[in-house]
Amino acid sequence: MKLFNKELATALLVAGALFMEILDATVITTALPVIAADFNVPAAHLSIGVSAYLVAVTLFIPLSGYAADKFGARTIFIAAIAVFTFASVLCGLSTSLFEFTLSRILQGLGGAMMVPVGRLVVLRDLPKEKLVKTVAIITWPALSAPLLGPVLGGYIATHFSWQWIFYMNIPLGIIAILASLYLLRNTKGDVGKFDIKGFLLTGVGFALFMAGIEFLASTSDKLLQSLGVIAVGLTLMILAIRHVKKAKNPLFSFDAMQHKTFRLSVYGGSVVRVALGSAPFLVPLMLQLGLGYSPVEAGSLLLWLFAGNLAIKPATTWIMNTFGFKRVLVVNGVLIALGFVALAMINHTTSSFTIAAILFANGVTRSMHLTLINTIAFADVPPNKMRDANTLGAILMQMNRGLGITLSALAIAAAALILGQSPDAPNLQTFTLSMMFMGAVALVSIYDSLMLSKEDGDSVLNKRKAKKARQS
């Protein structure tokens, strides 16, 4: 029996890097009032620190695949971790909003290179039969970090000082760099001339789109400006797609879209990610503003969603191998929609135990679906297309993350309008309608799953092993 599995260790390393990146996008949200007081600015102004990070990540992700092939995957991965860690130190040392924002932009640059390159290292040469287990490992940060971030940030800001939110990245970064030197090969790929036009169109287009939806979610008095930024971003993205299809050496291509299983992760996968991404935003607000729970009580209940994420993990591979992708995606998609209905039915008489059970069940279906979508995305993608598929997937996941929060904010505003209430003072009825709306969004994603055949994605499954396990 092998005591050390290098493939497993590499997957855990990349999962840790992904956890750091996503955690830093969410961990400061509950600490914003404390940081704002130190900078002597209104707390609302600190939202630029959140937006700057997310926009910077989106801006530089298209560059990640090219940089990894040009300079070596290990070189870029280690450099990205170093930049991310150094920027974390600068964030902690910041004494003004301007310094803090610049540090967050630099941190976003590191995060943009760190996560996609890390995933590429794991996925490019991975045998298909190991894809299911590996993706399950590197998916858990996307499940846990958005839930743990606000709770951890609030705890650190309350019991220590907000600077430690960033300083805790220092030992993690050092460990990740040392592990990378031992575990990773500095593989390079064939690259042509750098596609600067493609980078500007894709990077700026995606970044403006993300900035627009961030503004849309956080401001109610600048609707036209936000929509204008989104429109410019979408225009640049359309021009980028046209450019990529015609360019001889594009920064990345859309060839992976030829595979039905990858298209599922792009279309239906994006829809369900947006719906699932709304839960960490809507649930705490509903518990506090709708039901009168304290921030600590709401955060504690939200951890049951995280518990559900973890509880199903040991069974996800067996479920996929036993029932196949199509059946599980369709059934689980319906369960996700029903989960939002259950959240919508919560009222003042609902016990904390029942709320915890509903959140736990939602965590189970959330974990199952994201693992399915992230696995089937690469099931039929050959190694020579993995870089482009990985880059496109990373961009979409970043955009889905922002869209989930924006759509949640818009759902609250629309529900308040329907009920004749103020969007600035939502009550339980507002959240009931919002949850029902997000359930409908989740249900729409099932359409793409129904278009799959029973055999789609079978190349990465081990059905014979699952059948043997059932018979024993």
Labelled PLM ranges:
Residues 38-40, 72, 93-99, 160-161, ...:
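Helix-breaking motifs and short loop linkers at transmembrane-helix boundaries and internal kinks
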Residues 61-197:
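Helix-loop-helix hairpins in multi-pass membrane proteins, especially solute transporters
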Residues 7-23, 28-30, 43-50, 65, ...:
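12-transmembrane solute porter fold
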Residues 1-6, 450-472:
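Intrinsic disorder in cytosolic terminal tails and internal cytosolic loops
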Residues 58, 85-86, 109, 170-177, ...:
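Small-residue-rich packing faces within the transmembrane alpha-helices of Major Facilitator Superfamily
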Residues 21, 50-53, 57, 84, ...:
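Structural signature of transmembrane alpha-helices in multi-pass secondary transporters
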Residues 158-268, 434, 438-439:
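Hydrophobic transmembrane-helix bundles of small-molecule transporters
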Residues 121, 125, 155, 211, ...:
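A residue-level signal for alpha-helical anchor/packing sites in multi-pass solute transporters
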